[in-house]
Amino acid sequence: MIAVPGYGLVYGYSWLDWTMFAILYVVTGLGITVGYHRLLTHRSFECPDWVKGCLLVAGGWALQNSGAKWTADHLRHHAHCDDPADPYNAKRGFWYSHCGWLLDPVPCNDERFGSRVMQDRV
């Protein structure tokens, strides 16, 4: 995330490049926070299928896995917060909880934690 604007400052981006960067930053952020997190994981609200589809596509653009996998991992995190079964256990350090856990081969029980999302037709 830091390297992309840094590269642009050194080598120069057009206004279109900077605009697309800003728009996609916001759109993918909304896809993850509103779509994957609030809608799929916590079921905070209901929306038409086309809105859900748009949020899932935007979340997919963030390259943080599918909505079903992301939700399963996050529900597992809530079920086992800061214990050894927590996929992004903060007790293992900032870098591990932020991105290192993705490299850990410990499998997530997607069938248990992601079954509700897998049954959604969207």
What are these model-predicted stretches?
Residues M1-V122:
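Non-catalytic, topology-defining segments of multipass membrane proteins
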